[in-house]
Amino acid sequence: MKTYEDLEGDGGSNIVGQVVQLGEKLRSRLDKIKHKVALMSGKGGVGKSSITANIASCLADRGHKVGILDADLNGPSIGHLLGIGNDLKLETKDDGIEPGDGYQGIKIMSMDMLLKTADTPVMWTEEADATAVWVSTMESTAIRELLADTNWGELDYLLIDMPPGSDRIDNIR
């Protein structure tokens, strides 16, 4: 087995190419969205998801095309709040994953749509000693991929329901 010192460049993984490709895909998706709004708080349980769902509903009432990314991967609730359960089967097409349609036609992508049941935990790693930095890195990567892989189409607003903690906003820029 080669050690880190034995590798030249990226060791053949093309990691730089993969990161560039994800960035281009993400920019392409977000270019079709007029306004992106992240709703966040330093503390959990303060009503971010409820406020996000209500803002989306008000915008949809005014005729705007609205989507929500539930970026609270460990406590997703947007699907439930807007009428989408765990039984929804997401459809993958050539242009990406089709988001679920909630009340008022609000497009939704949420981790709870990917889990078997509402109380299924998200397991980032099998290792009991995984550090918070490692888990945070996996979370931010998952959020970027959900944004990039979801076929949002043209939207007036994309609301991003952030997880608790103010340290996460830099991870999705």
Cite the ranges covered by each PLM segment:
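Residue-level signature of catalytic and energy-coupling elements of molecular machines
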Residues: I33, G44, D70, I78, ...
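Short glycine/serine/threonine-rich phosphate/pyrophosphate-binding segments
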Residues: K48-N54, G75-G79, M162-N171
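Extreme N-terminal, non-catalytic leader segments
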Residues: M1-V46, N86-D87
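Walker A/P-loop phosphate-binding motif and the immediately C-terminal alpha-helix
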Residues: H35-L73
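Short gly/ser/thr-rich secondary-structure transition/capping motifs
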Residues: G17-G23, K89-K93, S140-I143, P163-G165
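Phosphate-binding loop that captures ATP/GTP phosphates
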Residues: K65-V66, A71-P121
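Conserved, well-folded catalytic cores of nucleic-acid-processing
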Residues: K36, M40, R62, H80-G85, ...
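Phosphate-binding/switch loop-helix module in NTP-utilizing enzymes
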Residues: L115-R173
